[in-house]
Structure formats: C-alpha cells, structure tokens
Amino acid sequence: MRSMRSGRDNNICFLGFLSFALISLPSLSLALTNPDDVAAINSLFLALESPLLPGWVASGGDPCGESWQGVLCNASQVETIILISANLGGELGVGLNMFTSLKAMDFSNNHIGGSIPSTLPVSLQNLFLSGNNFTGTIPESLSSLKSLSVMSLNNNLLSGKIPDVFQDLGLMINIDLSSNNLSGPLPPSMQNLSTLTSLLLQNNHLSGELDVLQDLPLKDLNVENNLFNGPIPEKLLSIPNFIKGGNLFNVTIAPSPSPETPPSPTSPKRPFFGPPSPNASAGHGQAHVRSPPSDHHPSRPTPQGKEDSFTSKRIIWISILGAFSFVVLALVCLLCGRKCLRKREDSEQLSKPHLTSEYGRAREGSRSNASMLPPSNTFNKDKEARPKERVGGASKLHGGAERSVGSESKQESHEIDMNGNAMDLMHPSSIPPIKRVIAKATEPAEASLKRTTSKSHGPLTAVKHFTVASLQQHTNSFSHENLIGTGMLGSVYRAELPGGKLFAVRKLDKKSPNHEEEGKFLELVNNIDRIRHANIVQLVGFCSEHSQRLLIHEYCRNGTLHDLLHIDDRLKIELSWNVRVRIALEAAKALEYLHEICDPPSIHRNFKSANILLDDDIRVHVSDCGLAPLISSGAVSQLSGQLLAAYGYGAPEFEYGIYTMKCDVYSFGVVMLELLTGRKSYDKKRDRGEQFLVRWAIPQLHDIDALAKMVDPSLKGDYPAKSLSHFADVISRCVQSEPEYRPLMSEVVQDLSDMIQREHRRNDSNGDNQYTGRR
C-alpha cells in the first residue's frame, strides 16, 4: 500500500515537472536573438544613456522577437539598426564589435558625442553617423571593415588627417566626410577605391593635391572650401559633378601621366601668373611618379641661363599682348552684341502679345497671387519664358487630363510634341510669321533657369510666396494637432485658410540639403513648379525667410493609400478590385510622366503607398515629386535607401548605393502588391517568412491557386480571374531582381490601360463601370 502511494507521489511530481517544462518552453523558444547580439545592444543602450526607445532595455530582452524600435533582424541575428532623428545622446560605446552580423548602422541627425569607436563590427556594409557631435579622429580600424560600401560621417566635429586605411576597402561606393575639421593631404591608399562613385569632402581644411583621385570611377566629387593646391588632374575635369571652388588650385591643368615619354629640354615653365606648386605632380598609381626637377623649377641654374631669361621675357610680352588683344576683341564683340540684341528685342516685341495671348493669359488669370511676385522686369520676363518652358515639359497622357498651369481648366485634347513649337497651341490667325521667336521656345527649361538664377535670387516661379507669420497663423503655430506626418526631410502640417481652403505645409529640416542656400532652394521651387500632371500633387506656394524653408502643396482629404489599405477599414471596403486597378494606373501615369515625359526627366526616389495621396474621389496624387535633389544629397540619400530597403520598397541594387528609374519601377511593383494583397510591404507582426511582402509573394504570383489565396480578403472574391492574372504578371515584371528586366513605366501604363479597356468592354453590356468614382 505504501509503495503504491509512493509511486503515485512520484507520478504527480513527474507530471508537475513536465507541466512546468511545457509552460516554460514557449518563453524559451521565443528568445530568438543571438545572445552575443543581445549583449551588444544592451551595451549600446547604456552607452547612449538609456534613451526612451520602445522595447530597448539595459539587460536581456529579445530585440528580434520583440521587435525593438529601429532593429531589423535576419533569423536570430541583428542586421540593421536605424535610429534617425531620435534625439539620442551619449556615445556609441565599445561593445559594437560583439554584434555577430550587423550590416547597417544609421544614427544620423542625433546628438551622439565622443569619438567614433575603434571597435566597429567587421561585418558593417553601411555606416551613417552624420549630423552628430562626434569628435577626435577617424579611427584607423576602418581598414578592417572590408565589406564597407557606404560611409557618411559628415556634419560632425571630426579633426586630424584622413587615415591611410583604404587599401582593402575595394567595395566602397560612397564616402561623405564633408563639414568637419579634417586637415592634411588625401591618403595614398584612396587610389585603391576602384568602385568609388561619390566622394564629398567639402567644408574642411584638407590640403595637398588631388592626383590620388584621378583614376577612380567618380561621378560626384565635391572638394570646395578646402586648401587643396597644385594643378587639377585633367581626368578629374571629366567627372559629371565636380565642384572645386574655394581652394588654392593653380590655373594649370596637370596632364595625364605618360612615363614612357621623357621630358623635353625646351618645355616651357609654369605661367608667370600662377605660383609654382611645391608638389606639382602628374603621377598616379602605387608609386607617385613626380615630374623630373628639370626646368620646371625656375630656381635651378642651367648652362643656358641667358637664353632661358630671354625666352621668359619673350613669353611674358607675348602673353601681355595676347591678353590686351583679347580685351579689345571682347569689347568689340560686346558692342556689336548689344546692337544685335536691341534689334532682336525689337523684332520680338511684335510677337510677345501673341505668344502670351492664349497660353500665358490662362496662367495669369488663374493666379490670384500675382501681386505677391516681385515687380519690375523679373516678372515680365518670367511671364514670357514660362510658356516656352511648358512646351518642353508638356505631356502626352494616356487618357488622362493634364492640369493647366495653376488653373482648374483641363487640356484633354492637346497632345503637344516635345520637339515641336508653340505654333501648335494657337489659332493660326494669331501667329505672326516670325520664325526666330518660335525657335526660342525649344530652349531647355533648365538652361534658362540656371542662367537666370545666377543673376538674381528673386523667385522665378509664379506660385505664391507665403510668410512665416501667415503659415503660423494657418497651422496654429505648427501645433501637434495640425501635424500630418514626419519624414526624412521634415514635418508636414495641415494649414486652413480663412475661407476653409486646406493646404499641406512641408517644413524642411534645417539639416536637409539646400536649406541654407536661398538660391538653391528657389531653384528647387522652380523645378517642382514645372512638374505638372493630373496625378501629381501640385505645388501651391513656398516660404523662404528667417532661415525657414517651407513648401506648400494641395491637400488631399482622404489621406494616403497606405492608411486606406492598412489602417482605415471603413474606407478600405470601398476599394473594389476595379478601383485598385485604376489607382495603380494613375500612379503609373505619374511615374511615366516623371521618367519619360517631364523635361528634364526625374527620378522619384521615395515611391511608396504612403506617398500616394487620394482626393475626395479616390483619385491619385503622388507626393514628394521633385524632391529627389534633397533626397539624393549626403546622408539623406543613404537614409532614403535604408528606409526603403528596411520597409520592403527598396530594389536589390540599393545594397550597392545605386538608384535609377528602374528602382522606382521596383517600388511601384511593391505598391501593386499592397493593392493586390492588402498587406504591408513590411509587417513585423507576421511570421518571419511573411514579413517582407515581396519575398513572400514572388513564388506565388504564377500559381493560380496560390494567387487566389493571396488576394485581399476584404474583396471577398469579387474580381475577374483574368484581370487578377494580368495584374500579377505586371507585378512580377516590376519586382525582377535584375533592373534590366524591369519594364519602362510607359509599358506598365499600357498594360494596365489594356486591362481596364478589356473590363470596360466586358461591362458595357451590363451598363456597369466600376473604374470611375469611389466604387
């Protein structure tokens, strides 16, 4: 009896232990994060002075399983930490090397100080520390980061020399060290950066020559406001975007090196008006080949001293006579040119009333804010120039209506040839037979803009100029209640005018590019104002005063497509299948206009469902168009790429710092997937294999049964099977991993238009047209 009771007690104990183990098992299995990564992120949290970040703790925790803010994982390993403008302080600490596979780290625009740690993770590919308070020198341990491709350390307090650490960093694509206190020459190992395309060094105290850069595949090089000297290597002058002002360069251009050619004994000296550089070099490669110190050094004595002296004097006199002749010739040309210009202006006066009579008057009449523009000739010239620019940027829409410049009227019947002339827009009887005036209409808009903005800082655009005081009044002093959203370029507020008219006011962050330079900001305003399409958010006005830079756009009451699909269940019900296809088509037309019709072409760079605004009729208005110059500069560019990639919109080539029109196409394909499935592009609440929408969806797009299961459940199966299949085919082409296999946006527009036409024909017999209105 006693043995039976003891056996029963043992069974009870065993069952109790088993129950405890089963209860504990889920909590153990949920601890997904690698322990080394947990220790590293705990150490980072303490070094940052324990900021208020959702999920973050000083000890333990599960960053991957609990989705800590700004932390992205791959399986159990932390791969990305993005904490931009999070008001962080403290330092980065010394525990970063404990991360096992951290690839991207972005702490831009915070208040982090101290020195940059020498214990950075060797797995790093992207490092963004711009806009902080880092001091000290750039660590030499960078040489161990052999996977590093992008590094932004700009806008800090770094000092000392750039370390000679680039020997093994052959994957580097972008480097931004601008706006620090760096000094000394460029390190020789920089010549090993065989994949470097962007190097920004402006606003430092760097010195020496640029010869170590001459064989690099650079597309962007900014060295302005430094102490660089010597001749500029000839190869650097072919860089598409080379900014070099504010240095001590000689007028002489250093020739390309040719080691096999010996120096000529009678080669001329440096020009007398430029001081000889102590380090004048034409060399490159591993050993810096310097020019032999023959007669390039005037202080060196030679046997033919008298002949050299005579030759020098002769060269000086020839130079003086040549300069004098050039001045005389320039004066003659100037006088003749002014006479010709007067004659030309006289002839143009005959045609100006006709050129502005129909096209220009529509623009003037539609603008109630003409009095806000600067008086005098600036406005008069602009009135005549704008219609000419418009011809270059006019669009051929696929069944869509193009907005008139600042008016509610539509020009649905006009198809304007971009290579044609202004005569096609007017009644023949109103055109004087002056061919010279018509030919001027084909002048590229950007050329005219650059020429004019270089002479004046006044606004050339006809959009309204608001004051800061008026915008404060209309936004309740930019109150939190009026805040619509916050992005990488600043915050957006709702403004309500006394008559009830609503606008969206974008307050640009003071750290964003072009913020300080008013001329560049006004040029940006002009460029945005020229982007006019029925499916693109229209610029209404701007503000540039008291160091504030603001852009005012039209307001769309139904918010964003992202909110409609993922937040507002009430309105989501109204998104029938046909309406979703129409939304995709209108968004595609906006990108087609930017890529293939707008002059000059434009890349969006930030295309996502949150930037697709919807008006009262659920019509598409794409926002952030024309802001690519802000996004493509410095740390903001890397931030844009990181965010798009982190949230599932980024094309695979983002990893290499590449952004082209085909990246916009990829992002558009992701938005189409959102319309198809009703899912977010990245949803950390879903199972790990379903968090990134593209990865989850691609294998199923060509499986009929799987495709039907992917469709947004809120559609309740109400969609044509063929239309669904065609929609999936377009998505599949847009999200191809190789950019060359993605279609042009005009092809996408054609495919979606054909889909709608087929459905129109199918529904005509039923009198049902669901592609219009809110249904």
From Swiss-Prot:
Has keyword Nucleotide-binding?
no
LRR repeat extents: 101-122, 123-146, 147-169, 171-193, 195-217, 218-238
What residue range is the signal peptide?
1-31
**Main localization of the protein?**
membrane
**A GO CC term attached to the entry:** plasma membrane
Compartment(s) of residence = Membrane
Give the Basic and acidic residues compositional bias ranges.
380-391
- What residue spans carry the Pro residues bias annotation? 256-278
Q: Which residues lie on this side of the membrane: Cytoplasmic?
A: 336-775
Provide any one GO MF term from the record.
protein kinase activity
- What happens when you mutate S395L? In strain: cv. Landsberg erecta
- Comment block on domains: The protein kinase domain is predicted to be catalytically inactive.
Name of the molecule in the record: Protein STRUBBELIG-RECEPTOR FAMILY 1
The organism encoding this protein is Arabidopsis thaliana
Name the gene that codes for it. SRF1
